[in-house]
Amino acid sequence: MLRFGITTRITQANGYEESRDSLAHDWGDFFTREFPKDIWASIPNIGNDAVRYFQSLSLNVLIISGGDSIGETPKRDETEYALLEYALKNRIPIIAICRGMQLVHSYFGGKIIKGDEEFSSIHRAKMHEIITEENDIFSINSYHNDLILEDNLHSDLKIIARCTKDFTVEAFVNHSLIGLMWHPERAMVDSKWSNEIIKNFLKNYHD
């Protein structure tokens, strides 16, 4: 059985002073639909202690979720870097989504670049096409302001998809992780293909 642990973003609720850890309801729908026989748990932003929390629940897959940019919420950064390092050292499969993919890129020494107005016109709350290494074209959703360039990518990370318009990196893999710049939990044209990428990664990892 897969036991997913998924990180959360830090948000402010209207009318309340304290910060909250939150996760879009889309993720609950995603797990129910795509992994109905498996279980999942959200991970609070508690810094390095998140590793002990992950262990205490016997989780065996890490999802680093999207939302916001690296550096905006230091406690979340600390939490996710600690979990990422733990998962890499212990060969726990990692699925990194949007900001999560950027976090992986940063961990491996890559530079996160802020997109300009032209970039945002393609990638900010849009649908656009990507091309895979097999030259297949798919339509995905896009919600990010930051970008990853191929010439700044660590050699351990293999590109598997690029944007057809500006050729920025949209997905990469290595032996223990997959990074997707789009949001598989949200609606898009080629969601079936996107979900199969994740399932095949997990299947190959555990075979």
Predicted regions mapped to residue ranges:
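Glycine-centered loop/turn positions within well-structured domains
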Residues: 102, 110, 146, 178
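The feature captures the conserved acid-bearing segment of alpha/beta-hydrolase catalytic domains
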Residues: 143-150, 169
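N-terminal beta1-alpha1 cap of cysteine-dependent amidohydrolase-like domains
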Residues: 1-99, 106-107, 113, 118-126, ...
